[in-house]
Amino acid sequence: IDVQADLSARGARRSVAPTHKLTVVLADALAALSVSFAEVLILLVYMAFVLRIDFGNQVGYIVLTCLAGCVAGVSFGSLVGTFVRGSGSVKTAVLIGLNMTMSFLAGLMWAPIKDLVSRKVPPLSYVNPAALISDAFYSLYIFGSHPRFFINIGLLFMLSALMCTASFMKLRRTRYASV
């Protein structure tokens, strides 16, 4: 909301500021990523030391997966925030709906759907961040395969870059009749 001049006073100020839009978008994204990743790290510490969940020798890979997931989440939020017109409530509703759909298609709500999607619509498995994140964890703990893990992480970072680029291009081209 704060990047669109017609939706908030802060957005109006930002759109006329002499600061390059890419700088503003990157600063916002880094701030959101820092908070998101810190929350996930706190959760991992809680799981490891309070709940005593043993992550084995894969902790570095788990942290990398969490970082890639946070980057994808922030990028996806930026994409939706830039392209969806409406209030914060509308954007939140769209984000929740899309996240639930991606989670369902990744097999996180009904396990057989993951296999069905991978057989009937294979490309969907490669562009669904929820599927890539869950498959990264599966590849570490079920398959024990690092090449598959790194493919998932690479795809997550590529999707994130595409979403950030699309957000920036849309934001850069937006013009307002009056601010």
What function would you assign to each model-found segment?
Residues I1, M47-F49, G81:
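Hydrophobic alpha-helical transmembrane segments
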Residues I1-A17:
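Transmembrane helix boundary and interhelical loop/hinge segments in multi-pass membrane proteins
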Residues D2-V3, R52, G86, F143:
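Histidine kinase transmitter module recognition
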Residues S8-G11, L43, G77:
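Interfacial helix-capping/hinge residues at the ends of transmembrane alpha-helices
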Residues S15, I42, Y46-V50, S134-I142:
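Regular secondary-structure segments
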Residues H20-A29, I53-G60, F83-R85:
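Short juxtamembrane and helix-loop transition motifs at transmembrane-helix boundaries
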Residues H20-M47, V63, L67, V71, ...:
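Selective transmembrane-helix segments that form parts of the transport pathway or gating/packing helices
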Residues N57-V179:
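Membrane-spanning alpha-helical segments of multipass transporters and channels
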